[in-house]
Amino acid sequence: MKLISWNVNGIRACIGKGFEESFAALDADIFCLQETKCQQGQVKLELPGYYQYWNYDNRRGYSGTAVFTKKEPLSVVYGIGIEEHDKEGRVITLEYEKFYLVTVYTPNSQSELRRLEYRMHWEEDFLAYLLKLQESKPVICCGDFNVAHQEIDLKNPKTNRKNAGFTDEERACFGKVLESGFIDTFRYFYPDVEGRYSWWSYRFKAREKNAGWRIDYFITSPQLKDKLKGAEIHSEIMGSDHCPVELQITL
């Protein structure tokens, strides 16, 4: 089973940069998007063979998530049941017979860390949500977590120590997710590899120089460990400031 997650930084813009060709080439069983930045009715994607599920932010041109899946889920839930968080369209959960699939667009702490306090509330509530799901079925969660966990997960750790996405607080929260048992699937296969990133600033020719961050993840419940088959970061695929990340799993 092949799963893809991609922060498209605006699906309408990404469509103009070859999204549909990349989608077809990747041929995923489940394809998750973050930061779709659209409202209902603004985008009509013809994707034969896929069921589509979209969650929208209340504001125009902000946040949003989507999931395209070849197999119809048993149920779909939008959000995590907390209005403060759910108004931004950040989470979609698909229930299948043997697992839950959750896609997430974690809030960015923003410049001057003005949203860090809110981010900490989000982290606590979202982890509680995942753990609650896990009580009944294993969980696969993917998306833009807006954090580089370790120094090997970004090009310039020293100069970014107090910047959004690499603060001690954000890293500690992601650490708690892993301490609760979830597996960072890319690091499961590549524990020490450096220079593999999923996001690059549009400034300073960052992508050309590979001055990036690994902030897009697939994490899974520990009981799926023996079913993990592979993980990839598709840095060759353009169309966004992020690239798609992949999980191969037998389910």
Annotate the PLM regions.
Residues 70, 94-97, 221-222, 247-251:
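Active-site beta-strand termini and strand-to-loop segments that position acidic
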Residues 1-9, 98-110, 142:
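Active-site-proximal beta-strand elements of phosphoester/diester hydrolases
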Residues 81-82, 107-123, 158-163:
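Surface-exposed cleft-lining segments at the edges of enzyme active sites
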Residues 1-47, 51, 57-63, 149:
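N-terminal, active-site-proximal structural segment of metallo-dependent hydrolase catalytic domains
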